Design a protein with these regions (language model features):
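Aromatic-rich carbohydrate-binding modules that target alpha-glucans
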Residues: 2-51, 57-85
Length: 85
């Protein structure tokens, strides 16, 4: 049985033209989110248990998700955090 869990990333940005999520779970490579009719951007990914830092880029500008937990890393940068258990 796999320890991997499905994780849902969502961002409310109805006026955005493009949204991606980047994190230490994927080597900080862009993962494209898809927009629904209400302006919600979302994607699913599968992760092993652990703590992951991530951020979004909205139309090329770095952004944190105000609805998700955040923490400062060792460099003093604020990033969103997801814990997979």
């Amino acid at each position: 049985m796999s320890d991997k869990k499905r994780v849902y990333f969502r961002l409310d940005a109805p006026k955005a033209g493009a949204v991606v999520v980047l994190g230490d779970f994927n080597g900080w490579k862009q993962r494209v989110l898809r927009q629904d009719k209400k302006g919600q951007w979302a994607t699913w990914t599968t992760l092993t248990p652990g703590r992951y830092e991530y951020r979004n880029q909205v139309d090329g500008e770095w952004s944190n998700d105000p609805e998700a937990p955040a923490a400062f890393n060792e460099f003093g940068s604020e990033k969103n955090v997801v814990v997979v258990g």
